[in-house]
Structure formats: structure tokens, C-alpha cells
Amino acid sequence: MHISNEYLYEEDKKNYLPTFKRFPLAFIKGKGSRLWDADGKEYIDMLAGIAVNNLGHCHPKVVKAVQDQAAELMHISNFFVSPPQVAVSKLLVDLTGLKHVFLTNSGAESVEGAIKIARKYAHKRNKGGEIISMKNSFH
């Protein structure tokens, strides 16, 4: 049985919470800046996976690094230290001249972290901790 874009889209609608509009495309493969859907049609990925695939899909060095890391340790909480986190934090501090970095894996975590940092900063200075946001904004 061929699993088509239409089939996957309809099945997805049965189970996936509709918090935002999804397109009736099911991408099943990526290479560089190209994507292929379930019907075999080729596309240029103009979104780069919402900017997280800035080296393209399945870049050999990224695939190798992910495979190597997954073979050692998949994930631990930020409550603990890991060698890759120490290395990338040092690299970013050295490159930017900043004192510290805060690593996250999503826009939502980045915004939540920024709010907490801003509130902590304001609290230490006995200033207001009010946060202003845009109505109906995504993050």
C-alpha cells in the first residue's frame, strides 16, 4: 500500500491537536535543501525546518555527530552537566565575548528562559518584573 500525502494528512487530523494550520504535505525524506513528499514530489525547503536545518537536511557531518552522540548519551536534564554542553558553551562564550550562554532547544524554551532571566534581573535590582507581550503572538 502506498502511503500518500492525502492518507497521512487525514490520519494526522484524527490524532494531532489542531493548534495551528497544517499543510496537506507529508515529507518523508530530505537531502541538502531538497525535500520529498509521500507522493514522490521534490521540493526546495525554503523554511529550512523553521531555520533549524541551516546546514540542510542530512548533512553528513551533522548525521555523524548525532549518531556518535546518540551512541554515548541521548539526553539528560539541564540539572546535570555534560561534556558537549560544556564544550559548546565555552565556544559560544569565547566567540561572542559574553560571560554566559543559555542553551535551549526551541523558541518556546528560549522565550521562557528570557522571561525568567529578565524577572531575576529585575528582582535583584528591586525593579518591576512586568513582562509585555504581543496579543496572539506565537512565542
Predicted region positions:
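Glycine-rich loop-to-alpha-helix module at the N-terminal edge of alpha/beta enzyme cores
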Residues: 42-126
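Short, flexible segments with low predicted structural confidence
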Residues: 6-7, 37-38, 63-64
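Conserved beta-strand and immediately adjacent loop positions that scaffold enzyme active sites
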Residues: 32, 100, 130
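A structural signal for well-ordered alpha-helical scaffolds and beta->alpha junctions
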Residues: 5, 9, 59, 85, ...
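Conserved PLP-anchoring active-site segment centered on the Schiff-base-forming lysine
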Residues: 121-139
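Short clusters of hydrophobic/aromatic residues that line enzyme substrate/ligand-binding pockets
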Residues: 27, 55, 138
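Active-site and channel-lining beta-strand-loop segments
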Residues: 25-45
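Active-site-adjacent loop/helix segments that line or gate small-molecule/cofactor pockets in enzymes
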Residues: 1-31
